[in-house]
Regions:
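Domain-level signature for soluble enzymes in the chorismate/prephenate branch of the shikimate pathway
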Residues: 1-201
């Protein structure tokens, strides 16, 4: 029987996600380092994976991992068929609309919006009755208005410092996010007793 597997998002969430597992009573035989992508708690027969945040919901939905810790922004953007078990008190950020500081009327009909989050962005503007053209990017979203690629952007924001440094102003909040503990639907039934103890940790 394969071990209970938990996928953690690499990057900013990872240290606090590991600390959360520690609160659950999970103790890894060997610590993670820059090359180690998986680690084991042999006492409890648990495997922990360190993978890209956008892959965590995929692993959990497909059953390659039983549970995962990832940002709500990723889960809601992907509309992943996973259980949203409970939010965790870290990884706070917002998906925001931002435009060049010099823009007088930035949100208008038929604007071009650059984003890494097309689903959440489309949904936000649809609810406002504004037609947009989406440009899907994978990084350096802040450069899009300056290069003429887009009129405005939606991007993750924690302090707003990066927006200001790139000559952008925050206009509206699209989505508030934090870390989320997610589960595979079948695994939740299989490991319900275990999950219940984690919820109380």
């Amino acid at each position: 029987m394969r071990p209970l597997t938990i996928a953690l998002a690499k990057g900013a969430l990872f240290p606090e996600a590991l600390a959360t597992l520690s609160k659950f009573g999970i103790t890894l035989d060997h610590p993670f380092d820059s090359r180690r992508l998986s680690a084991t708690d042999s006492k409890h027969h648990i495997q922990v994976l360190q993978i890209r945040s956008w892959d965590v919901p995929v692993y959990v939905a497909m059953g390659a991992a039983d549970f995962g810790i990832v940002g709500q922004d990723v889960v809601y953007e992907q509309q992943a068929p996973v259980l949203h078990l409970w939010p965790l008190p870290f990884g706070y950020c917002e998906l925001v609309v931002a435009a060049p500081i010099t823009s007088l009327n930035p949100i208008k009909a038929h604007i071009t919006v650059a984003t890494k989050y097309p689903f959440l962005t489309q949904q936000f503007f649809q609810e406002k009755g504004i037609d947009i053209q989406l440009v899907k990017l994978y990084g350096a979203i802040e450069m899009a208005p300056a290069t003429g690629l887009a009129d405005i952007i939606t991007d993750l924001c924690v302090t707003g410092k990066t927006l200001k440094e790139n000559g952008l102003k925050l206009l509206e909040t699209v989505f508030k996010s934090q870390a989320l503990f997610i589960g595979n639907k079948t695994s939740f039934k299989t490991y319900y007793a275990q999950v219940k103890t984690w919820m109380q940790a």
